[in-house]
């Protein structure tokens, strides 16, 4: 977990304090898997604090492509329950489906006029990155060779295979982050078009419905931040609806 002193870690303790005051029946927390290994034990301390005030706490790492989100996105889920211990894996099994591909999510957006709205307007790559994109398509490859990368991404910890990569049509995408506009932030080059993803495409890969409004985002940066940092709506639905199903079956009392 790289952001060990991230101020957002404090949100864990805010959740525990809120649970102590309001006593909800359930508390759900989502984060990256590395949060469990934070050297300050923020995640585990929060779990213990919830236990101390009477909650049964379970947590699991899940991959969102198991519930139909078209990306490889691992997340650490914690559910604290005033009732019985919630089996998170059982909830995931209730909604498990075949992985959805990039093609399934965004292929119909290729026909849109890319200049109509901020949502469908691709970013303009640098001259060097445009050459790298062209290289991927000219050679019909999905991973940019090391020698084609800038020197800072050829050595040490910067040699991630997905950086400067092209998405596969027939697979889930890599994890969508706020860096989806830039190929130097991950495998964000479109499978069929010589550009990186648009905000509309990234939102689809995050499982946002097309009717969802991002009108509050006035800039490309704010739009990317909202989309990339979001909890995919499908995950929220699965966890909440799954808990309700367990309640109706009498497994959470």
Language-model features: locations:
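Class I S-adenosyl-L-methionine
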Residues: 1-163
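C-terminal target-recognition/interaction regions appended to catalytic cores
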Residues: 124-253
């Amino acid at each position: 977990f790289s952001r060990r002193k991230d101020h957002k870690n404090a949100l864990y303790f805010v959740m525990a304090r809120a649970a102590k005051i309001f006593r909800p029946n359930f508390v759900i927390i989502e984060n990256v898997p590395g949060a469990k290994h934070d050297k300050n034990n923020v995640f585990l301390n929060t779990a213990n604090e919830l236990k101390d005030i009477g909650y049964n706490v379970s947590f699991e790492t899940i991959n969102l492509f198991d519930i139909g989100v078209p990306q490889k996105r691992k997340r650490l889920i914690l559910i604290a329950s005033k009732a019985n211990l919630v089996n998170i894996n059982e909830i995931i099994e209730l909604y498990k489906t075949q992985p959805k591909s990039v093609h399934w999510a965004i292929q119909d957006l290729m026909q849109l006029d890319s200049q109509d709205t901020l949502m469908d307007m691709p970013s303009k790559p640098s001259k060097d990155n445009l050459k790298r994109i062209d290289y991927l398509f000219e050679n019909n490859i999905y991973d940019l060779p090391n020698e084609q990368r800038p020197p800072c991404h050829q050595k040490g910890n910067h040699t991630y295979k997905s950086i400067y990569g092209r998405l596969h049509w027939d697979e889930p995408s890599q994890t969508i982050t706020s860096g989806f506009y830039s190929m130097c932030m991950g495998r964000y080059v479109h499978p069929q078009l010589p550009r990186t993803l648009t905000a509309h495409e990234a939102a689809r890969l995050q499982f946002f419905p097309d009717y969802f409004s991002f009108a509050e985002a006035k800039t490309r940066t704010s739009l990317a931040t909202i989309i990339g940092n979001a909890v995919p709506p499908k995950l929220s639905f699965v966890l909440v609806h799954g808990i309700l199903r367990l309640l109706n079956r009498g497994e959470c009392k």
